[in-house]
C-alpha cells in the first residue's frame, strides 16, 4: 500500500481488526520511510457497478463520491460517523444485491434519500435540494410538508 504522505510503497500493517460487524477490515499502517501513519479499509466488492447518469454517460460507481455527498448533507449535524458509515455500506450492499450491471443515478439518489430520512431530517432536506434540483423556497416548503405528513401518519398509528 502506497504511503499517502511520501508515496513510498514500503508500508507495514501495525494493527488489523474487523469493523462494521465484520463486513470490513480496518488496518492501521505505518510508512517505513517517513513514519507516516494512516488507516485503510478493506471491503468485499461483489461486482463493478456502472452508474448511468442523466446525460446518458456511464461511469464506474465510486463509494467515496457517495460518501462525500452524504457527508455534505450531514455537515455540522451531530450524527455519529459510524452511523453514517453503516448507512453508506447499507446503500452499497443494496446496489450490489440488485444484480444489475448498470444503476441509474436516480436510483442511487433515491436510496440515499430513503436512508437520510431515517437518520436526520435536515440532512434529508439538504440532499433532496440537490437531488431534486430545488429552484425556489416553495420546493423546500413542499418537502417539509411531506416530512410533516409522514410524522403525522406515524403518530396517528400510535393514537389508535
Swiss-Prot record:
- Zn-finger (unnamed) intervals are 3-34
Gene designation? nrdR
A single GO molecular function term of this UniProt record: ATP binding
Classification lineage: Bacteria, Pseudomonadati, Pseudomonadota, Alphaproteobacteria, Hyphomicrobiales
Q: What is this protein called?
A: Transcriptional repressor NrdR
* Similarity section: Belongs to the NrdR family.
A Pfam family name for this chain?
A: Zn_ribbon_NrdR
Note whether Hydrolase occurs among the keywords. no
Co-factor binding details: Binds 1 zinc ion.
Residue stretches making up the ATP-cone domain: 49-139
Tell me what organism the protein belongs to. Answer: Bartonella bacilliformis (strain ATCC 35685 / KC583 / Herrer 020/F12,63)
Q: Does the keyword DNA-binding apply?
A: yes
Biological role stated in the UniProt entry: Negatively regulates transcription of bacterial ribonucleotide reductase nrd genes and operons by binding to NrdR-boxes.
* GO terms of biological process kind: negative regulation of DNA-templated transcription
Record's signal peptide: none
Which cofactor(s) does the record list? Zn(2+)
Keywords tagged on the record: ATP-binding, DNA-binding, Metal-binding, Nucleotide-binding, Repressor, Transcription, Transcription regulation, Zinc, Zinc-finger
Amino acid at each position: 500500500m502506497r504511503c499517502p504522505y511520501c508515496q513510498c510503497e514500503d508500508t507495514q500493517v501495525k494493527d488489523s481488526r474487523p469493523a462494521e460487524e465484520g463486513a470490513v477490515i480496518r488496518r492501521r499502517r505505518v510508512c517505513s520511510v517517513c513514519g507516516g501513519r494512516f488507516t485503510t479499509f478493506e471491503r468485499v466488492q461483489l461486482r463493478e457497478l456502472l452508474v448511468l447518469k442523466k446525460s446518458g454517460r456511464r461511469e464506474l460507481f465510486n463509494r467515496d463520491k457517495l460518501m462525500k455527498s452524504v457527508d455534505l448533507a450531514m455537515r455540522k449535524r451531530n450524527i455519529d460517523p459510524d452511523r453514517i458509515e453503516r448507512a453508506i455500506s447499507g446503500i452499497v450492499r443494496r446496489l450490489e444485491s440488485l444484480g444489475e450491471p448498470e444503476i441509474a443515478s436516480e436510483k442511487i439518489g433515491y436510496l440515499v434519500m430513503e436512508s437520510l430520512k431515517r437518520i436526520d431530517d435536515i440532512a434529508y432536506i439538504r440532499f433532496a435540494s440537490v437531488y431534486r434540483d430545488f429552484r425556489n423556497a416553495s420546493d423546500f416548503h413542499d418537502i417539509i410538508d411531506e416530512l410533516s405528513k409522514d410524522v403525522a401518519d406515524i403518530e396517528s398509528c400510535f393514537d389508535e
